[in-house]
């Protein structure tokens, strides 16, 4: 989900 992507971006 989007939350996982945010973590990958380092945010």
Swiss-Prot record:
- Its domain of life reads Eukaryota
- Name the source organism: Nautilus macromphalus (Bellybutton nautilus)
Give the protein name, as stated in the record: Uncharacterized protein SMPP8
Tissues showing expression: Nacreous layer of shell.
């Amino acid at each position: 989900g989007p939350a996982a992507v945010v973590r990958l971006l380092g945010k």
